[in-house]
Regions:
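Transmembrane alpha-helices and adjacent helix-loop boundaries
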Residues: 1-187
């Protein structure tokens, strides 16, 4: 997840600083970019489970981190990128307290989304695949489609978190999104 957080952070930085997109549009767009990248890396790992899936996602981590470091023309390489603090109706969110309320509101929205997702058809399919993979497949659940969707949803959430984080710390580089961050999130 550390790599997809980095994708969201860099996507937000590129959208706001290079393309001039306002933060409030860049926030969901960076999540969408991270979701697309997550789904892209999810496709080859559809047949994998358990430890092998973990190894495949670690490979994605290293590939993404390599691209963040070596695509100087896009990410600034090891120098990183600078971003601006967002503002809300002219009020700059440049203090910890102000930014806290933004993050708190988005955490509430994310909680409501995930709570409703678990009650939906897709959420029930996720649970069925997690609990009994073969049984879900026999019952007609599109296991491949829902696994890709789960990669996309989780990457979207962490991509939005990366966007928020980038605009909080104001400077991002590939060193922020190492394998250690991914292990920290999983542990």
């Amino acid at each position: 997840h550390g790599a997809f957080m980095g994708v969201g952070a860099y996507a937000s930085a590129i959208l706001t600083m290079k393309l001039g997109v306002p933060f409030w549009f860049a926030l969901p767009l960076s999540g969408l970019v991270a979701a697309l990248v997550g789904m892209f890396f999810g496709i080859p790992s559809l047949r994998l489970k358990g430890l092998y899936l973990a190894i495949a996602t670690m490979a994605a981590q290293f590939i993404i981190q390599y691209l963040m470091r070596n695509a100087d023309w896009l990410t600034g390489g090891s120098d990183g990128m600078s971003v601006r603090a967002p503002s809300f109706f002219g009020l700059p969110l440049n203090t910890d307290r102000r930014y806290y309320f933004l993050v708190y509101a988005l955490v509430i929205l994310a909680t409501l989304f995930t709570k409703n997702l678990t009650r939906s058809r897709s959420g029930r399919a996720f649970v069925a695949i997690r609990d009994r993979y073969l049984s879900a497949e026999v019952m007609g659940v599109n296991v491949w489609g829902y696994r890709i969707l789960s990669f996309g949803v989780s990457s979207f959430m962490v991509g939005v978190a990366g966007s928020l984080w980038a605009h909080y710390v104001l400077v991002i580089s590939d060193e922020h999104f190492t394998i250690g961050l991914s292990v920290q999130y999983l542990a």
